[in-house]
A protein has these predicted regions:
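Hydrophobic face of amphipathic alpha-helices that form TPR/SEL1-like repeat modules
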Residues: 37-44, 55, 70-77, 104-113, ...
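Canonical positions in the second alpha-helix
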Residues: 58-59, 94-95, 126-127, 162-163, ...
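Classical Sec-dependent N-terminal signal peptides that target proteins to the secretory pathway
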Residues: 1-21
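Short helix-capping/linker turns of helical repeat alpha-solenoids
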Residues: 33, 41-44, 61-64, 77-79, ...
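N-terminal leader/linker segments that initiate helical-solenoid repeat arrays
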Residues: 17-55, 59-62
Length: 319
C-alpha cells in the first residue's frame, strides 16, 4: 500500500492570490479615523454598522482614503448599507487613482474574485508600483498562471525573487516550486533547496514540507524526517501523514508502529484523508493501538468525506 504523499506541485497547490481580509484593509495602526477603526474579525450590531457607515462615507467625501477603503468594504459586504459591488469598485478606483496602495490592492482582489484577471493584474501592478509587496506577489502569481496575461515564468520568477529578498516567504516558496518541479522550467534543486529552507526557517510550513519531499526523493530520509516533524508541529497535515509513513515503513528510522499511529492520528485530526485512511487500517488490524473496528469504520468514513474515493469503496465493503 503506497503511503507517501507526493510533492505538492505548483499547478495543484500554488499559494493563492493574496485575499486575506487582514491584507484587504488598512492595519489598525494605519487607520486615521480616531475611535472608529473597525475590526473586521468582530461582529457588530446593525446599528453600529450603520453608524460607522455614515462616518466612513462622510470622511471619504473629504478624501480620507483610509475611510474610503473601509467604505468600499462596507458596500461590498453589505454592512450598514445594501450590498453594491459596483459602488465598492468605484470607490476603490478613485482611491487607487490617488495613489493609495491599499485601495489598488483591494481593487485587484475584488477583480480577481470576479474572475476579471486582466483588470486584477492592472490594479495589482499599480499596488506594486506603490511598493505594496502583496500586490507584487499577486502580479507574479498572475504571470505564473497566465491570468490576464500570457503565462511568463521568467517574469514571475523575477518578481518572486524580489519579494523573497524582502522576506515575503510566499514568494520564496513559489520560486522554489518553479525550480523544483514545474513543466517548462529548468530544474535547479540547489536553488530550490535554498529557497525552501529560507521560508522554512521562518516557520512557513508548506515550504518545510516540500523541502522534506525533495530530500525524500533523493532518499535522504533523516533530513526528510526532521523537516516533516517541523511541518507537522506547525500543523501541516500532509507532513504528519508522511512522517507517520517513514516510521511505518522504516525509512531512515527504526520501524515504530506506535509513533506511526500517533502521527497518522494527528494527520487525520488535521483533515488529511490519507492520514484517516491509514489510521483506520491501524485500528482495524490493531497496529500500534488496540484493535477497534468501530473506530476504523469512523476514520474511513471521514477519509471518504474528505474526498478519498478509495476510502469510500472500502467503507461500502467494510462489513
Amino acid at each position: 500500500m503506497k503511503k507517501i504523499i507526493l510533492l505538492i506541485f505548483l499547478t495543484l497547490n500554488l499559494i493563492a492570490l493574496t485575499t486575506n481580509p487582514m491584507i484587504k484593509i488598512p492595519q489598525a495602526n494605519s487607520c486615521n479615523i480616531e475611535d472608529n477603526c473597525i475590526d473586521f474579525s468582530r461582529k457588530y450590531s446593525d446599528d453600529e454598522y450603520k453608524r460607522l457607515f455614515g462616518i466612513y462615507k462622510s470622511e471619504c467625501e473629504v478624501k480620507n482614503l483610509d475611510a474610503c477603503i473601509y467604505l468600499a468594504e462596507f458596500y461590498k459586504s453589505g454592512l450598514g448599507v445594501k450590498k453594491d459591488a459596483k459602488k465598492s469598485i468605484e470607490i476603490l478606483n478613485k482611491a487607487c487613482d490617488e495613489s493609495n496602495k491599499f485601495a489598488c490592492h483591494n481593487l485587484g482582489v475584488e477583480y480577481q474574485e470576479m474572475k476579471d484577471h486582466k483588470m486584477a493584474l492592472a490594479a495589482f501592478k499599480k499596488g506594486c508600483d506603490l511598493a505594496f509587496i502583496q500586490s507584487c506577489f499577486n502580479v507574479a502569481v498572475l504571470y505564473n498562471n497566465g491570468g490576464g496575461v500570457k503565462r511568463d515564468y521568467k517574469k514571475a520568477a523575477k518578481i518572486y525573487k524580489e519579494v523573497c529578498e524582502q522576506n515575503f516567504y510566499e514568494g520564496c516558496y513559489n520560486l522554489a516550486v518553479l525550480y523544483h518541479n514545474t513543466p517548462g522550467v529548468k530544474r535547479d534543486y540547489k536553488e530550490a533547496i535554498k529557497l525552501y529552507k529560507k521560508a522554512c526557517d521562518s516557520d512557513f510550513s508548506i515550504s518545510c514540507y516540500n523541502l522534506a519531499t525533495l530530500y525524500q526523493e533523493q532518499k535522504e530520509y533523516e533530513k526528510a524526517n526532521k523537516l516533516y516533524f517541523k511541518a507537522c508541529k506547525l500543523d501541516f497535515a500532509d507532513a504528519c501523514n508522511n512522517l507517520a509513513s517513514l516510521y511505518d515503513d522504516a525509512l531512515g528510522v527504526e520501524k515504530d508502529d506506535e509513533v506511526a499511529f500517533r502521527y497518522y492520528n494527528k494527520a487525520c485530526r488535521l483533515d488529511s484523508a490519507s492520514g484517516c485512511k491509514h489510521l483506520a487500517y491501524f485500528y482495524y488490524h490493531g497496529i500500534g493501538t488496540k484493535k477497534d473496528k468501530k473506530l476504523a469504520e469512523k476514520e474511513l468514513k471521514k477519509a471518504c468525506k474528505l474526498g478519498l474515493k478509495e476510502a469510500c469503496e472500502i467503507v461500502r465493503d467494510f462489513h
